[in-house]
């Protein structure tokens, strides 16, 4: 069973066509990068996977669930199995790094409230393990706002892992980072995906990063899929030509 399947997904916002009959699948454990310019539909498509957006036509199947038909407890259970890492880190500056990571457990454990003192020891230890994995265990008790941008995004990745997801969605996770930090964060996501058989669907606009870290690249332009290929079968020039250059839309597989 595919981890995610898009079947003719179309999305309109008023008169604006954001997605135009998008169809492709993401297999379990696969790292797929959505590549395209701002406004190409990448973020909109990601938000269909956990039901933040609903399709105007077509459907999305995630972890065996028809997302558009999921309601109540069924939708909550689906979202528990999916984590999201955003371009903006969304850390709580006044909390410690460890406390921020612990908040990732709020969605799966009942009776927890924001604040370190309410977290069971097992939750704190798990959070420390994730911080160790992202190389920030020594900063666990610092305030989150004392970290660099790259470090804060690594905290966001650790927080996402606290949810114990089966799918990780990442929306331009390195857009605000310098090249070195970008490579570190993408490398970390790639390594964790391999270790945990974690399915990753990530949006980027940097071609070289996508080619370096993805199993497969799906290119979007004007809401349409114009490219769907294994990253190893593409070079920089091909990707740029298909995704970023003007001209008639023509999908290649």
Curated annotation (Swiss-Prot):
Q: Which SUPFAM superfamilies match?
A: P-loop containing nucleoside triphosphate hydrolases
Q: Which InterPro entries match?
A: AAA+_ATPase (IPR003593), ABC_transporter-like_ATP-bd (IPR003439), ABC_transporter-like_CS (IPR017871), ABC_transpr_PhnC (IPR012693), MetN_ABC_transporter-like (IPR050086), P-loop_NTPase (IPR027417)
Which molecular function term from Gene Ontology is one that the record holds?
ATP binding
This protein's record includes keyword Cell membrane: yes
Q: Could you say which protein family the record assigns here?
A: Belongs to the ABC transporter superfamily. Phosphonates importer (TC 3.A.1.9.1) family.
UniProt function note: Part of the ABC transporter complex PhnCDE involved in phosphonates import. Responsible for energy coupling to the transport system.
Protein name from the UniProt record: Phosphonates import ATP-binding protein PhnC
- Provenance organism: Frankia casuarinae (strain DSM 45818 / CECT 9043 / HFP020203 / CcI3)
Organismal lineage:
Bacteria, Bacillati, Actinomycetota, Actinomycetes, Frankiales
């Amino acid at each position: 069973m595919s981890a995610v399947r898009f079947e003719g997904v179309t999305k309109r916002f008023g008169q604006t066509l954001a997605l135009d009959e998008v169809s492709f699948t993401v297999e379990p454990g696969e790292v797929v990068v959505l590549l395209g310019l701002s406004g190409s539909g990448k973020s909109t498509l990601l938000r269909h996977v956990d039901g933040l957006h609903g399709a105007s036509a077509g459907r999305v199947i995630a972890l065996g669930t028809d997302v558009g038909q999921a309601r109540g407890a069924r939708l909550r259970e689906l979202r528990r199995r999916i984590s999201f890492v955003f371009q903006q880190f969304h850390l709580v500056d006044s909390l410690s790094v460890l406390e921020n990571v612990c908040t990732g457990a709020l969605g799966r454990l009942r009776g927890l409230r924001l604040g370190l003192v309410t977290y069971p020891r097992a939750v704190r230890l798990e959070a420390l393990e994730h911080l160790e994995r992202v190389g920030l265990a020594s900063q666990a008790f610092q305030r989150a706002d004392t970290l660099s941008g790259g470090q804060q995004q690594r905290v966001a990745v650790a927080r996402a892992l606290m949810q114990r997801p089966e799918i990780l969605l990442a929306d331009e996770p390195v857009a605000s980072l310098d090249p070195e930090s970008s490579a570190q964060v993408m490398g970390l996501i790639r390594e964790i995906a391999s270790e945990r058989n974690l399915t990753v669907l990530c949006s980027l606009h940097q071609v070289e990063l996508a080619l370096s870290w993805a199993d497969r690249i799906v290119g979007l332009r004007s809401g349409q899929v114009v490219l769907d290929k294994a990253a190893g079968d593409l070079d920089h020039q091909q990707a740029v030509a298909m995704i970023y250059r003007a001209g008639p839309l023509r999908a290649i597989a």
